UniProtKB/Swiss-Prot annotation:
Originating species: Lentilactobacillus kefiri (Lactobacillus kefiri)
Known role: NADP-dependent (R)-specific alcohol dehydrogenase (ADH) with a broad substrate specificity, able to catalyze in vitro the stereoselective reduction of several aliphatic and aromatic ketones as well as beta-keto esters to the corresponding enantiomerically pure alcohols.
Biotechnology: Because of its broad substrate specificity and its ability to produce chiral alcohols with high enantiomeric excesses, this protein from L.kefiri is a very interesting enzyme for preparative applications in the synthesis of pharmaceuticals and agrochemicals.
Keywords per UniProt: Magnesium, Metal-binding, NADP, Nucleotide-binding, Oxidoreductase
Protein's name in the database: NADP-dependent (R)-specific alcohol dehydrogenase
Binding positions for Mg(2+) per the UniProt entry: 252
NCBIfam families, alphabetized: PRK07231.1
A Pfam family assignment: adh_short_C2
Co-factor requirement: Mg(2+)
Enzyme Commission number, as recorded: 1.1.1.-
Length: 252
């Protein structure tokens, strides 16, 4: 622990598993106070307890697509830990279908979480953190799928590409208005998560050098450490940028 995030107060959506949990863990390790969110209370409470006590981390049940719930989430976080300085919009879902085969219901559900949820968190984050001298940072989780197309991820591609460009717009607006709020995107490649563990042969397939030139997939902490940097004052001149962590996938 080096206290890189001492004095920071962060909200991490989808923070109960995988990448989100790793981000929350590293944030606390580096001195931040954190609220993680998720849809399932039992999973969320267990996740928070695995990281630390209620003096440093708490769980709030919240669906990122619930617009009204965002204000309550900020209020609850600030009552517990003080002014929010950092928002990590990490919550997301996937539908493995082509554009042709994706139903309207599937399309709207995915975008409600992956895009609307990020929009709600970004908008309210700006409104609540601007002009306060907090060194505020909004970190929006996109994906390598925000850069390249995948024939079986039509809706997911759309959502992650939209997050990438929307974040640039927000970053420019905040910079030009001297809000002291930075907005950046993180683009994971293939990462070892519970979902990957549950899919037989998935890790081996993703580790092929034609997909990941480094020959192995990443770990959640590979993404978490990038987020620590972006949440810290070390990244005070970084905004509107894309941070790709993919073992060389998009360099091909």
């Amino acid at each position: 622990m080096t206290d890189r995030l001492k004095g920071k107060v962060a909200i991490v959506t989808g923070g109960t598993l995988g990448i989100g949990l790793a981000i929350a863990d590293k944030f606390v390790e580096e001195g931040a106070k954190v609220v993680i969110t998720g849809r399932h209370a039992d999973v969320g409470e267990k996740a928070a307890k695995s990281i630390g006590g209620t003096d440093v981390i708490r769980f709030v049940q919240h669906d990122a697509s619930d617009e009204a719930g965002w204000t309550k989430l900020f209020d609850t976080t600030e009552e517990a830990f003080g002014p929010v300085t950092t928002v990590v919009n990490n919550a997301g879902i996937a539908v493995s279908k082509s554009v042709e085969d994706t139903t309207t219901e599937e399309w709207r559900k995915l975008l409600s979480v992956n895009l609307d949820g990020v929009f709600f968190g970004t908008r309210l984050g700006i409104q609540r953190m601007k002009n306060k001298g907090l060194g505020a940072s909004i970190i929006n989780m996109s994906s390598i799928e925000g850069f390249v197309g995948d024939p079986t991820l039509g809706a997911y591609n759309a959502s992650k590409g939209a997050v990438r460009i929307m974040s640039k717009s927000a970053a420019l607006d905040c910079a030009l208005k001297d809000y002291d709020v930075r907005v950046n995107t993180v683009h994971p490649g293939y990462i070892k998560t519970p979902l990957v563990d549950d899919l037989e042969g998935a890790e081996e397939m993703m580790s092929q050098r034609t997909k990941t030139p480094m020959g192995h997939i990443g770990e959640p902490n590979d993404i978490a450490w990038i987020c620590v940097y972006l949440a810290s004052d070390e990244s005070k001149f970084a905004t509107g940028a894309e941070f790709v962590v993919d073992g060389g996938y998009t360099a091909q």
